[in-house]
């Protein structure tokens, strides 16, 4: 940040009365804190795909009403790091209750969405046939039609 930007921030921490009338569409009620605490963002899974796009996967175990905001924060962080790569986002719901989260955010000046899937929609047989033990373990969370088959494959 340049010294000019810092000086302007200091000046406008308390915006002059007349300028506020010009810039603000409605009179200012109160001044709010200008700093935002920074938190380290960490996604569950991030990879570059063969087509040069970036795939982001989040696993979520409960219905979080703030999930669209979290996914937007992740999207912006990924976009900042990989600005020339298309970004594909997927939320995989692994909770016990019915999936009720929204996968989009619609505000006056912003529209944002991502893909979402309930892991129970995935046929467990695909994962059970994998040589990777983690795939087989995750199969327990997927759609299970034959529990005996599932148990045999896990043992």
Region locations from a protein language model:
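Elongated, amphipathic alpha-helical interaction scaffolds
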Residues: 1-155
């Amino acid at each position: 940040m340049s010294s000019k930007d810092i000086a302007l921030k200091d000046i406008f921490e308390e915006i002059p009365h007349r300028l506020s009338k010009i810039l603000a569409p409605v009179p200012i009620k109160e001044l709010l804190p200008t700093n935002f605490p920074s938190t380290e963002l960490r996604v569950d899974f991030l990879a570059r795909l063969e087509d040069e796009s970036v795939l982001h996967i989040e696993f979520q175990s409960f219905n979080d009403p703030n999930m669209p905001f979290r996914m937007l924060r992740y999207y912006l962080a990924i976009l900042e790091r990989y600005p020339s790569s298309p970004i594909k986002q997927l939320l995989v719901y692994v909770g016990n209750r019915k999936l009720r989260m929204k996968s989009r955010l619609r505000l006056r000046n912003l529209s944002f969405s991502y893909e979402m899937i309930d892991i129970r929609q995935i046929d467990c047989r695909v994962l059970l046939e994998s040589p990777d033990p983690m795939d087989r373990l995750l199969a327990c969370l997927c759609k299970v039609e034959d529990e005996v088959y599932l148990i045999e494959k896990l043992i």
